[in-house]
Amino acid sequence: LNGDGIIIAVIGEYPYAGGYGDNETLSINSFDQDILKKCYNSGKKVIVIMLSGRPLIIKDHIQKWDGFLAAWLPGMAGEGVSDIIFGDYNPTGRLSFSWPKNIKQIPIDYTDENYDPLFKFGFGLNY
């Protein structure tokens, strides 16, 4: 964390689908939270790449991030993530679901009466 520049923090879920089954939490795990705290305390810009198979609850963190890329589970397509980070490709993806602010919003649907997600169905940014 020394020196100039920005920090690219790669966080995500521990593998769960191929082994012991479902993971019951949608929170950022404690190890990644500790990493993020160190990044925040550095005073540098922080770009977060999240590797997960579903939206995690990030509301308490995202305001501290200067950039965010939900890379999902890219597998062999991970090279595409670096293309986006280094500006070789302009991201064009859109959410095919609503990203909840908190666990109490689950299940969430864009037709819900009090619909107020963190990111709405169809949300997506590019450069």
Language model: regions and residue ranges:
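C-terminal non-catalytic regions of proteins with extracellular/luminal or membrane-system context
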Residues: L1-Y127
